[in-house]
Amino acid sequence: MDFCWKREMEGKLAHDHRGMTSPRRICVVTGPVIVGAGPSGLATAACLKERGITSVLLERSNCIASLWQLKTYDRLHLHLPKQFCELPIIPFPGDFPTYPTKQQFIEYLEDYARRFDIKPEFNQTVESAAFDENLGMWRVTSVGEEGTTEYVCRWLVAATGENAEPVVPRFEGMDKFAAAGVVKHTCHYKTGGDFAGKRVLVVGCGNSGMEVCLDLCNFGAQPSLVVRDAVHVLPREMLGTSTFGLSMFLLKWLPIRLVDRFLLVVSRFILGDTTLLGLNRPRLGPLELKNISGKTPVLDVGTLAKIKTGDIKVCSGIRRLKRHEVEFDNGKTERFDAIILATGYKSNVPSWLKENKMFSKKDGFPIQEFPEGWRGECGLYAVGFTKRGISGASMDAKRIAEDIHKCWKQDEQVKKI
């Protein structure tokens, strides 16, 4: 990929009717274009840099890891031990705790970007990306403060990930409640201090919902938790080590169902019978359910103790909302001052990527499941869609960099001939 190739491509684009009719700046990129500067995008850019390949990283926000920096609550820690959340090549600092804080994780990512000299193009919203059959290249249209830019590249990496857009459910009467009280997604929630003395309903019983309830409790709020579906709650640590680390170790030697049975027996010994608290367990074990559906078990950091003491109340699903009131599926009605939606996030790939083979239009995930979903056709790649957190993204980043490097070397050999 040299200067001559770039000039040749610019020559072709000079006679392209799209460039003539559209007031946009055209940028020919010799390396890959990566969409998204979260941990997945940074990991991919770093792995490419290690192999001598420079990429262009497009990020719609004004900072790296915008989900972590702008849309997470203050008390957040990594839910898994740091060794399972490291990006490729550079580990966490040795003096970081087992479960780094939100700010420590951000510092790690910023240092990671500095050490690899990764400088994303910020405030760039990718509106579309499509493969041009005539050019044999991807055309990525991005809108920023200085107008529209079209990036033309051979390789395109979708790194916007699983958590690009908040999932906001609609309940009957939501507008009426919002007119009198507060309704916000966890992406706008920072601290329970904003709700001291308030009656708050938290919708969603995943790790975020559970931890937000605990945070509200610690600041003197009166939280209730909507639990509509069955959920696995495990202690964050068991037998003197992390539950996740112990699970990964046992899976090397035992079948998944036997490991699940072990986890549930130990969890019951430590936490008690969660069904007595209104938290029914799914039929499948926690690890098997994670593999099949991607649904992550909750790692308890103190919320169950508050449920047992009655400081956090467990409620059934919501039927409808009224002004200051919530009617539940069991027919009960209660008053609340605020509702926090801990209802997760979704992929936004279908909104900008114009292709029909690699990504599902339904959920925005690769159609091929892990570990096969990282590579598509025509130089298209995906990172951060494994449903296996940062460790899964790191695995894909390494594969992508190696694959692009292989193509890069082949091109160089052809030119020498």
Curated annotation (Swiss-Prot):
KO phenotype (gene knockout): No visible phenotype, due to the redundancy with the other members of the YUCCA family.
Signal peptide region: none
Enzyme class, first EC level, given as a word: oxidoreductase
The enzyme's E.C. designation: 1.14.13.168
Cofactor list: FAD
Expression triggers: Down-regulated by heat stress. Negatively regulated by SPL.
Binding site for FAD: 36-41
Pathway(s): Plant hormone metabolism; auxin biosynthesis
UniProt-recorded name of the protein: Indole-3-pyruvate monooxygenase YUCCA6
Originating species: Arabidopsis thaliana (Mouse-ear cress)
